[in-house]
Amino acid sequence: MAKKRGKPEIDWTDDDKEIIWVSKSEIKRDSEHLKKLGAELIELTPQNLEKIPLDEDLKYAIRQAQSFKLEARRRQIQFIGKLLRNRDSAPIQDALDKVKNRHNQQQALLHKLELIRDQLINMGDASLNQLLSEYPQLDRQHLRNLIRMAQKEKQINKPAKNYHEILQYLKSELIV
C-alpha cells in the first residue's frame, strides 16, 4: 500500500473547517531539522544529556548511537529523528541551547581570566590592586608572589610554571 505524500492538518478552530496541507518539502525540512537535533544530542556528554528532558526510549537510542561507528551511527540518527517526530522538540531544543550556551559562557570566562593573568604579569601592582578591588576574596600575598615569580621566569626564559599557576589560582577562586 502506497504512503500519502502530503499530510493534511485539520484546523478545527476555523469556522469553515478548512484543511491545511503540509507540503512534502516542508515535511522533509522538518525531518532533516530533527535529525540534526538528534546528531547534536549524540555529541553531548552523559552529564549534559541528563539536563535535557528526554524519555527513556530516546535516551536509550542516543546512548546506543554514541557507541556506534559511521553507517550504523547514521542509521541510528535517522531513527532518533523518527522518534523526535512523535514528540514536542521545542523543550529539547531549548535545553540543548542552554547547555551549549553554558559552554560558551565558560569559554568566555576562561578567556577573561587569561587576559587578567596577562595584565597582572605585564602591569604588576596597578592591575593587582584593581583586581583585588573587584574580588576581595583573593589572597594578595599569594598572588603577588606568583606574579613576581612569573615575571622572573619570563625574564630568564624559564618554563612558565607560575604563569600557569596564576591562571589555576584565578580559576579555583573565581569560577564557581
Curated annotation (Swiss-Prot):
GO terms for cellular component: cytosol. GO terms for biological process: assembly of large subunit precursor of preribosome. The keyword Signal does not apply. Gene3D superfamilies: PSPTO4464-like domains (1.10.60.30). InterPro entries: DarP, DarP_sf. It holds the Pfam family DarP. Keywords: Cytoplasm, Ribosome biogenesis, RNA-binding, rRNA-binding. Its main location: cytoplasm. It comes from the Bacteria. GO terms for molecular function: ribosome binding; rRNA binding. It is found in: Cytoplasm. The keyword Cytoplasm applies. HAMAP family: DarP. Belongs to the DarP family. Member of a network of 50S ribosomal subunit biogenesis factors which assembles along the 30S-50S interface, preventing incorrect 23S rRNA structures from forming. Promotes peptidyl transferase center (PTC) maturation. This is Dual-action ribosomal maturation protein DarP.
